[in-house]
């Protein structure tokens, strides 16, 4: 963790040292380019598929970070926008309605409709904060899921709890990513092709998130997060700025949802439950709210960690006790929950918080203890 932080810190601390700057980026680019081949060779397609889902979660976490991290609005129903993007892809590229639109047409529509849903959620909740906002957004997420689950009568639109299958894979003209791609000198497996597509989409979303954070809108979000009354007194149109946060976050979720549907080729309401919203929120909080590198790290870690525990829960019991005493799935979630508790106990600002967030936590800790009691460093 510290080595990773130092590596990315070097990228920002030496903007004028071209050799260090470009060498660091070249090494990172080389790692990202070769990672799917290394994972497939060393761990098999199962972990390569997990890596692809990790990139989808990176997109989701960055979208939720706009709402929760930048603007300070607690959204517990964020997964609804993921569902909107996924179902739009499913309806426009499957035998359900006999439509087979291309990706370049579906993704913008999915992003736009998800953004519209974000505005529809944000408009009636503009005066809510904290727990009240969390309850309303949680209800919104469940309404969308139940709506999709029951929209099969009297007209069958979503196929109800059975979901929509036989969804078109992502394709570019006659090239489908569902099949191995023949490059002439080598054959690229389908999962590797999806990895590069998801990586490209994630990099675009990262770039947009960075530009938003550094823009006037990003500074307005930060002002609202710190003190909405003061922000309004400074002339910030808090209504429009908060709506923009909901819309932008939902747009990212819609893009990720569309790519998920094209990758999975099946969607059902069960994929968009409350647990998914909680998981994405955990990625943002544990990684470091408002800090883009921290959110990315949190998304990658919380995607890989449960699967790691899944693979070791049974063998560890077998080696220690000679038999499996506890159901591996239950033990996996117990170990995962314990890891989350430990992180929040010893790293309340997240695993990789922004410097400003770290200072805020330290100030709160100093205010809560007598002056002669030393405060442990973050």
Listing of model-derived features with the role each one plays in the protein:
Residues 2-378:
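Transmembrane alpha-helices and adjacent helix-loop boundaries
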């Amino acid at each position: 963790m510290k080595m990773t932080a130092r590596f990315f810190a070097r990228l920002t601390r030496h903007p004028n040292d071209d050799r260090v700057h470009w060498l660091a980026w070249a090494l990172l680019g080389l790692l990202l380019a070769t990672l799917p081949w290394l994972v497939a060779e060393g761990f098999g397609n199962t972990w390569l598929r997990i890596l692809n889902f990790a990139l989808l979660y990176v997109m989701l976490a960055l979208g939720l970070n706009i709402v929760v991290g930048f603007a300070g609005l607690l959204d517990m129903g964020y997964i609804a926008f993921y569902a909107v993007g996924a179902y739009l892809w499913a309806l426009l590229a499957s035998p359900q309605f006999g439509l087979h639109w291309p990706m370049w047409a579906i993704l913008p529509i999915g992003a736009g409709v998800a953004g519209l849903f974000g505005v529809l959620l944000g408009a009636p909740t503009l005066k809510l904060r904290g727990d009240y906002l969390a309850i309303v957004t949680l209800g919104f997420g469940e309404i969308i899921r139940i709506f999709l689950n029951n929209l099969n009568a009297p007209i069958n639109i979503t196929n109800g709890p059975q979901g929509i299958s036989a969804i078109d894979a992502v394709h570019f003209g006659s090239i489908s990513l569902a099949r191995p791609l023949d490059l002439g000198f080598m054959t690229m497996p389908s999962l590797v092709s999806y990895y590069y597509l998801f990586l490209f989409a994630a990099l675009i979303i990262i770039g947009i998130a960075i530009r938003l954070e550094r823009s006037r809108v990003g500074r307005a979000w930060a002002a609202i997060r710190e003190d909405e009354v003061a922000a309004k007194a400074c002339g910030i149109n808090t209504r429009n700025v908060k709506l923009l946060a909901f819309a932008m976050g939902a747009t990212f979720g819609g893009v990720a949802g569309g790519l998920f549907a094209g990758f999975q080729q099946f969607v059902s309401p069960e994929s968009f439950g409350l647990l998914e919203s909680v998981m994405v929120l955990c990625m943002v909080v544990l990684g470091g709210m408002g800090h883009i590198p921290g959110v990315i790290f949190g998304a990658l870690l919380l995607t890989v960690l449960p699967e790691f525990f899944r693979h070791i829960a049974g063998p560890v019991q077998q080696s220690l006790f000679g038999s499996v005493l506890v159901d591996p799935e239950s033990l996996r979630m117990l170990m995962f929950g314990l890891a989350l508790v430990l992180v929040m106990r010893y790293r309340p600002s997240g695993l990789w918080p922004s410097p400003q967030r770290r200072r805020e936590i330290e100030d709160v800790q100093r205010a809560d203890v007598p002056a002669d009691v030393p405060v442990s460093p973050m």
